[in-house]
């Protein structure tokens, strides 16, 4: 009887662990959740984001867990989504490839597919970098490339 109880407790423990693991997105997901919650105590922007998760796409919150550099971008999303704030990428030298970030606030809130460039615009951002380096043109932004892709779909 004692062995049966021990086996049942082990099975129950494994089941509870499996459920908790899946709900949290894995061990690292659980650690990330807890880490951000702790950081939110001293970061008002992060606190606002976590208190208003319903205003953000799930993928955006998950990206924030993996990359805290996104705090400002995510924080501004509700008021800036759909807006693009420039028609150039800045100074460019032909033969040199500029570093562009898809979550740059100048174009990152522009629509791309079912989300915004800042979340899934690595292709348009990379393409804009290549065009700038090959041609020296600074007037092809990640949003321009994404717009072309959206029309082509």
Where are these regions (language model features)?
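N-terminal Sec-pathway targeting helices
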Residues: 1-12
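Active-site-adjacent structural segments surrounding the nucleophilic cysteine of cysteine proteases
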Residues: 16-152
């Amino acid at each position: 009887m004692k062995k049966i109880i021990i086996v049942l407790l082990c099975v129950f423990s494994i089941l509870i662990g499996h459920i908790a693991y899946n709900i949290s997105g894995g061990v690292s997901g659980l650690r990330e959740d807890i880490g951000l919650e702790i950081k939110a105590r001293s970061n008002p922007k992060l606190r606002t984001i976590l208190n208003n998760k319903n205003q953000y796409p799930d993928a955006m919150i998950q990206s924030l867990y993996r990359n805290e550099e996104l705090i400002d971008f995510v924080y501004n999303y509700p008021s800036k989504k759909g807006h693009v704030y420039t028609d150039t990428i800045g100074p460019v030298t032909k033969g040199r490839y500029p570093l562009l970030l898809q979550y740059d606030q100048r174009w990152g809130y522009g629509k791309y597919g079912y989300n915004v460039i800042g979340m899934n615009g690595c292709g348009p951002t990379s393409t804009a970098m290549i065009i700038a380096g090959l041609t020296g043109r600074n007037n092809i932004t990640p949003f321009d490339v994404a717009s072309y892709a959206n029309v082509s779909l």
